[in-house]
Amino acid sequence: METIHFTKVHGSQNDFFLVDEEENHITEWSDEKRANFAIKLCDRKHSLGGADGILYVTKSSEVGPIGQMRVVNSDGSIASMCGNGLRTVARYLLEKHALTDAKVETMKAILDVKKATSLGFDIPTYQVEISPVKFAAETLPMHVGVEKLFNQVIPELDAELAFSAVSVPNPHLITFVDQAVLDSNKQEKLASYLNSENPYFPDGVNVSFVKRLSDDAIYVRTFERGVGFTNACGTAMSACSLIKKMLDNNILETPLNVYNDGGRVQVTAKKDAAGEISLQLIGNATFVSKGSVRYENDIVTELTNEATAEQAQYQALVKEVKEFLKTTE
């Protein structure tokens, strides 16, 4: 029998159980055990309400970063990156080490994180780096007959929609649409197909439909690989922001407001001397509750769960966002 302590967290209502492997003495768990635990704990029918995944936090394998984040989705699959999750991990580790900025190791890169100015309503807000950014088909991987997909119709996917693809480093397929397409079932049908066995994206892909709201604002809805529709996907919002800036010839460094069903974030971008692009995702890092479970014979049983006051703060932002989005329909 094992007792596992957790913090229930969310970034833009993309929710997770954050589990510190060192404090729980589970650093020797196998990947299979981590996956099985995630499947059980993240079940939406569980008494704790489930989650989109587990953020396993442990020591970095490199010198410099203050910790490492590993993301396991609710279906047990591994995500190479999660922007919303990284903001909450950034907060957890920065508070643990009494810092305001540092580096955190993820599966594909070591990324800068720091505390940021609040989005409003006294919401804890953090900024995290999203990189590397790659457009080559092999980095997704993608097989649609082109080496780089940018604002192009792919008849096999849809006869009318123009798609762009980018890895950040997890793969994203993005198209800009109007409200009528958002209201249709096109996204669900396409995303479900591309995340089952198919010849175009053999490893699956995150599929985002984006609506322009103004010169400095977009709305993003994402079907996440391994999860399905979520309130928000941090890497998707970052990737969509970059594509918008490229399509509209926007200044990379200018903040873009990104609205989603889970709230609002800001995204900026920059290009270094070598021409490499990196993104900065700025948004909430909300701690919903702290608790513990018993894990025995592949069964997860709730022991404790104490809520914080932070969700009420975030819901004030959500109310503001919903009222704004109504005016854009």
Curated annotation (Swiss-Prot):
Keywords, in A-Z order: Amino-acid biosynthesis, Cytoplasm, Isomerase, Lysine biosynthesis
Pathway where this protein functions: Amino-acid biosynthesis; L-lysine biosynthesis via DAP pathway; DL-2,6-diaminopimelate from LL-2,6-diaminopimelate: step 1/1
Domain of life: Bacteria
Single GO MF descriptor: diaminopimelate epimerase activity
InterPro entries to which the protein is assigned, alphabetical: DAP_epimerase_AS, DAP_epimerase_DapF
GO cellular component, one term: cytosol
Record bears the keyword Amino-acid biosynthesis: yes
PROSITE patterns (alphabetical): DAP_EPIMERASE
Binding site for substrate: N14, N73, G83, N84, N170, N206, E224, R225, G234, T235
Cystine crosslinks: none
Enzyme Commission no: 5.1.1.7
Positions marked as site (Could be important to modulate the pK values of the two catalytic cysteine residues): H172, E224
Keyword Amino-acid biosynthesis among UniProt keywords: yes
Cell compartment(s), UniProt: Cytoplasm
Pfam families, per database record: DAP_epimerase
Reaction equation(s) it catalyzes: (2S,6S)-2,6-diaminopimelate = meso-2,6-diaminopimelate
GO biological process: lysine biosynthetic process via diaminopimelate
Active-site positions on this chain: C82, C233
Gene3D superfamilies: Diaminopimelate Epimerase, Chain A, domain 1
Family label: Belongs to the diaminopimelate epimerase family.
Function: Catalyzes the stereoinversion of LL-2,6-diaminopimelate (L,L-DAP) to meso-diaminopimelate (meso-DAP), a precursor of L-lysine and an essential component of the bacterial peptidoglycan.
Quaternary structure and interacting proteins, as annotated: Homodimer.
Protein name, UniProt field: Diaminopimelate epimerase
Organism lineage: Bacteria, Bacillati, Bacillota, Bacilli, Bacillales
